Amino acid sequence: SPKRNPRLATELARCFKAFESENPSARQERRRLLLANKASLDALAQGARCADASFRLEWERGFSGRLPMMLEHHSLVRLGILAAQSALDHGDSERAVQHLLDNAQLGCDLLHTPVGMVSLTGCLLISITTFEALVEQGMLPRLSPEGLRMLADGLYRLDSELQRPLLVREG
């Protein structure tokens, strides 16, 4: 389990703001954040590739016992978005898509938790990954044709895991 960084949300917000303002130090800050949190990104990728990933609830500890915290997961997903941006900047569309799909898989896994608040967190993570990263931050047009196919296939696979599909695929 990676070490928690209580300042991560603040550092991520500063990094995203630097990119929005086209600050020259933004890439250096992103590189620093990605290196400092490599263990967290590796754990996210490992969990995304588990066939039966879920969040273990410890009911005996009460309601707060090991419930996923929205801020921690939000920070982890934003870290994954930074990794995807970095991969795109290096021309690696497929690696960028894999980071985004890892994020979406985390959201999907949380949707299967029997606690409403946690399920809503899962929805938020999927939304951040698909809408915020791909649309608002302009990643979608930067993906290669192979990256787009990989993204479509990955989202279709994730959609099939949901009780009520979000996507409709024709043909």
Regions found by a protein language model. Give the residues of each.
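Aromatic-rich surface patch/π-platform used for binding flat ligands and interfaces
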Residues: S1-G171
